[in-house]
From Swiss-Prot:
It comes from Bacillus licheniformis (strain ATCC 14580 / DSM 13 / JCM 2505 / CCUG 7422 / NBRC 12200 / NCIMB 9375 / NCTC 10341 / NRRL NRS-1264 / Gibson 46). GO terms for molecular function: D-ribose pyranase activity; intramolecular lyase activity; monosaccharide binding. This is D-ribose pyranase. InterPro entries: D-ribose_pyranase, RbsD-like_sf, RbsD_FucU. PANTHER family: D-RIBOSE PYRANASE (PTHR37831:SF1). Its main location: cytoplasm.
């Protein structure tokens, strides 16, 4: 049994298998998952686990080169937008329209669904390299 870090075997394998520029999505409870993209469903109840908690844990174990979020998050959910800016202060954050964001999720290696119940609390994490 692992002693540290993410214990969820699906997420641990996903992170270990990522290559440079691969993407994963951290999603709120309502984001649709495109056909063919694996979903790792962590949602237990509305709000649990939350977007911030899951995003922080993933970011601690992943080399993140850049982040993509829906541009609507800045006006509709400024608290989550501020969290993303603080958490990824050393990475570029691209803001795109929500419809384009949903289309971009079709290229992800997986969608990790949280129980988050606030609007536009989603992000695409683009893998970097450790060297």
């Amino acid at each position: 049994m692992k002693k540290h870090g993410i214990l969820n075997s699906h997420i641990a394998k996903l992170l270990a298998d990522l290559g440079h520029t691969d993407t994963i999505v951290i999603a709120d409870a309502g984001l649709p998952v495109p056909p063919g993209v694996p979903k790792i469903d962590l949602a237990l109840t509305l709000g649990t686990p939350g977007f911030r908690e899951v995003t922080k844990l993933i970011a601690d174990e992943m080399v993140v080169e850049k982040v993509t979020a829906a541009q609507e998050i800045e006006s509709v959910n400024p608290g989550q937008a501020a969290f993303l800016k603080a958490e990824f202060s050393n990475q570029k954050i691209d803001y795109i329209p929500h419809e384009a964001f949903k289309k971009a999720t079709s290229q992800a290696k997986a969608v990790i669904r949280t129980g988050e119940a606030t609007p536009y609390a989603n992000c695409i994490l683009h893998a970097g390299v450790i060297f």
